[in-house]
Amino acid sequence: MLHMQINLIKKYGAESLFLILLLCLPINDANSSPWATPDDLLAKHDLQMLTDSGLLNIPINTWPIAWGDVAYNLKVENVKDLSPETLLSLQRIKQRLIDEELGGISANAEIKFAKNPDRIMTFFDPVNTKKLAASSASYLSENMAINLKFEKTDSYELLDESYISLARGNYSMTLGSKKNWWGPGWMGSTALSTNARPIKGLSIERNFSDPFQNRYLGLLGNWDLAFILGDIQNAN
């Protein structure tokens, strides 16, 4: 058995075997994460609907967005007054909050193909290479989030979006890399977008966008903060 395992690793590579093993496991639709991430088109649509309808009052232009902030600031008084479209968005977001609250360990695997890959990345996260295989595993608890992701194409192997994050009070500190999207756009952003690889380094973010307690600064309303310190490589 040991001889067979060694031959398999030599033939296919350890990363490929890791991907095959994950494909054989029962997996969730999405990895457990404390944030709604830039590539979740449906979540962006639903959060925009809830914000426009006045049910949610948080900044939604700095992704990733903390699910805890969404849960804390989601205010629904009378469901009967909602339009069918807004009600559907509300139901989907509530279900996402329940799923993310469960936490625990989850795994995911994906294989993508594209005849004509997109050169420009959008919020939809299109395929920018002809072939891509990726596997990821994550762990989520009350104060800790860990994600390990491996991507392989014909030309590169990446560990982007791998991180460990610790929450302390109203702030979380993350070491590694996460996708960022700063701006209201869907097709692109002039600040930060997924068109470049995520920045590897240290990031500090607010978990809840509560307004200032000062009666003057409180007039600014809910606010967010994201600090990123990292090295942007030439390849980006």
Label the model's feature ranges.
Residues 124-129, 151-159, 196, 233-236:
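Solvent-exposed loop/turn segments connecting transmembrane beta-strands
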Residues 120-123, 187-192, 232-235:
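Extracellular loop and loop/strand-boundary signature of outer-membrane beta-barrel proteins
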Residues 15-26:
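Bacterial N-terminal signal peptides
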Residues 135-139, 162-168, 175, 202-208:
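Residues on the lipid-exposed face of transmembrane beta-strands in outer-membrane beta-barrel proteins
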Residues 30-124:
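N-terminal periplasmic/intermembrane-space "pro-region" immediately following the signal or transit peptide
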Residues 59-61, 80, 95-106, 140-146, ...:
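Short loop/turn motifs that connect adjacent beta-strands in outer-membrane beta-barrel proteins
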Residues 111-117, 141-143, 150-154, 168-170, ...:
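Transmembrane beta-strands of outer-membrane beta-barrel pores
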Residues 181, 201-236:
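Signature for the C-terminal beta-barrel architecture of outer-membrane proteins
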